[in-house]
Amino acid sequence: MKSKKPRSLLGIEGMESKEINALLKLAARMEPTRRRNTLRGKTVVLLFYENSTRTRSSFELAAKVLGATTILITATASSIEKGESLIDTGYTVRALGADAIVMRHPSSGAHWLLAEHLDIPIINAGDGMHEHPSQGLLDALTILQAKKKFKGLKIAIVGDIYHSRVARSNVHLLPKLGAKVVLCGPPDLCPDEMAKIASGIEVSHNLDHALSGADVVMSLRVQKERLVGRQIGVEDYIANYQITPEKLALAKKDAVLMHPGPIIRGMELTSEVADGHASKILAQVHNGVKVRMAILQTLLAKN
C-alpha cells in the first residue's frame, strides 16, 4: 500500500491473520441494535454497479447504526448509465463530500483502480469473480461463533467455485487462520486450478469425499449469469452436488451449514437443509451487519 493513502479494504489476499483477527474481535463486540455516534458527520457512499440485497442493505444499516449518513448510487439511476467512467464517478462522489465508498463492480480489480485515484477509503463489496472480503469475514465470524476456533477444522465449500468471489475470499482467509478447505463441484465449475489460489487447498469432484468429516459445509449457488461458454446439466448437478439431509449426514454430527445467498432452493440445497437445525444462514445475515460495522469503524474512525 502506497504511503499517504488511506486504509482500504480491497481484498483478503493481502491481509495478515493479525488484521483479520482484529476485525473479527471488534465485530464480535458490535451490537446492531445499539446506535452510536462513532461516525457522526461522516458520509458513506454506496456505489453499486451490480444488484445486491444483503450486502448493500447491511452496509447501509451498519453505517447508520454508527451515526454516518449514507448515499446510494446505482448504475441504472446515475450518469454511469450515460457512459461516465469509474474514475470520473469517483471524483464526483469525492467532490460531493464522501468520506468512504463502498463499491460493487462487475470488473475484477476495479476497487484497486479507484483506490489509486482517491484519497478516501474504498471498501470492496464484490468485484467480478475476484473477491468479496466482507462476506469472507462474516463467514469467518459465523464459523468462530459456532466452533470457537479455526485450527484443525475441515471446511467444505460446494458449488460454483469458479465464478464465486465468495469462495475466493474464503480460500484466502480460512487457511490463514488454520482451517483446511476442500473445494467441491463439477469440473467445469470447480477446475483443479482452483487449488492454486492459496496453499493447502484441496479440490474434489466427489461430494461424499468433500463432506466426509466436515465441520462446516458452505453451499454456493450456480451463477447462471456468469456461465459464459460453460455448460451445466441441472439434473446432473442436483444428482451429484445438491446438499440434502442424507448428504449433510456425511459431515460431523455437529457440523454447521452455511450459504452466502441468494439461495436457490431445490438446486444447490434442499429446504430441509436450509431450514434445518445445522443451518447458520440467518446468523450469517446478522453477522454481516456486525462485520461491516467493524470495517467502517476501523477505516473511518481513524481517517
From Swiss-Prot:
It is an enzyme of class 2 (transferase). The keyword Transferase applies. GO terms for biological process: 'de novo' pyrimidine nucleobase biosynthetic process; 'de novo' UMP biosynthetic process; amino acid metabolic process. SUPFAM superfamilies: Aspartate/ornithine carbamoyltransferase. One of its GO terms (molecular function) is amino acid binding. Pathway: Pyrimidine metabolism; UMP biosynthesis via de novo pathway; (S)-dihydroorotate from bicarbonate: step 2/3. Belongs to the aspartate/ornithine carbamoyltransferase superfamily. ATCase family. This is Aspartate carbamoyltransferase catalytic subunit. It comes from Koribacter versatilis (strain Ellin345).
